[in-house]
Amino acid sequence: MPYIPPEHRPPLDEHIDRLAAALVREAQTLPGEAAVAGLLNYALTRLILKVVQLRFGAWRYWLIALVTGVLHNVAQELYRRVAAAYEEEQRRRHGDVEGFAASGPDQPEA
């Protein structure tokens, strides 16, 4: 969960803002809107590898589980906060997919 205490945010935010600006600048030199995906993947991978190297030195199973769990939680929280609202708006705008309403938890049992 990304909700760290407020006093821990400013020292990180200035670096995050600079990295984000650098990623956007680099993405603008590449063809296609989706080119930013590779840059984000690279930046996140390098950040994780560097933090593990500086803090722990070597990978251990518990650390692999911890890092992959964090990445999984990041994806889930982003989906919950951003994608779910977007998808719900599209469902309202364009209509539901046939079959979801009939099999959803809000339907009475037959």
Each model region followed by its residue ranges:
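Solvent-exposed interaction surfaces and binding hotspots enriched for charged
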Residues: M1-A110
